[in-house]
Amino acid sequence: QAILNIFKNAQQALTLTENPLITIKSRITYSQPINGVIHSTLCEVSIIDNGPGIPQDIQEQIFFPMVSSKESGSGLGLSISQDIIRIHGGAISFKSESNGTTFSILVPINIESLNEEAKSA
């Protein structure tokens, strides 16, 4: 749901972009702190668009409920996404410029449980 919310925001941001592009990347990364806790293995997902970027005046509040850069938006998508990601022990961040926005999600992976699932499959 979190990734879908961010993807929908990217899609809506591209309505006036001449050659719209959304890129989703994922990778495994190691030993990074999230909210002061160091996790040994994490999944990082990045959603990148080439839209106009998030207006500077709302960037600091972008994860607050009811904050939206769109007139038709509810302002709940990013707030809900952040809550979902935090429930799973993860973190979300973004970088936005006039030529696009990148949202990055980091979520810890429990390698032991993945290995157990693979063995029982």
Locations of the language-model features?
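A short glycine-centered beta->alpha linker in the GHKL/HATPase_c
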Residues: 14, 52-55
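Short conserved segment of the HATPase_c
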Residues: 41-42, 54-66, 121
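Acidic ATP/Mg2+-coordinating residue in the GHKL
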Residues: 49
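Short alpha-helical Gxxx[C/S/T] motif in the catalytic ATP-binding
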Residues: 77, 81
